[in-house]
Amino acid sequence: MAISKILNMKDCGGHFHGKHLKRALDYVMNPDKTQDGRLVGAINCQVDTAFEQMKETKRNFGKIDKRQGYHIILSFKENEVNPDTAFEITQKFVEEYLGKSYEAVLVVHDNTAHVHSHIVFNSVSFVDGKKYRYEKGDWAKYIQPITNRLCQEYGLSLIHISEPTRH
């Protein structure tokens, strides 16, 4: 079982655009939480230069302000998955959900009782400059269903998504 959630990172203003994005990348890539960096990967960018590449994409398309990026967390049930399997699941999630359009860093943290993954990705597509658009309901429509399907493929338990009650 893995529960997912998505957070956004806004621009902090001032002269250092992307401060929150940089902090998120630094936090998730902490060697103490990722087996000295063994559980760190990237898609459509290089791990060591991910922040610079993301900023360059924003510059190229004139979108350096406002929303800087997004942070998805996949939290697995305690003792249900090992870090390597969590990494495989996370990598497949990123490939399917973000495709070939967004620069993303993916990591697994194994420093707590439950293994969990972090995905930090650019808000601007390096392919066409379009900003990622998260709509209300996307979690239940796309994010958690992909997570559930991947967990099912690996024999993990699932989160059941209930339809909202209407009055």
Feature map (PLM): residue ranges:
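N-terminal nicking endonuclease/strand-transfer module with a His-rich metal-binding environment
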Residues: M1-S162
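Short "domain-exit" segments at the C-terminal end of structured domains
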Residues: E163-H167
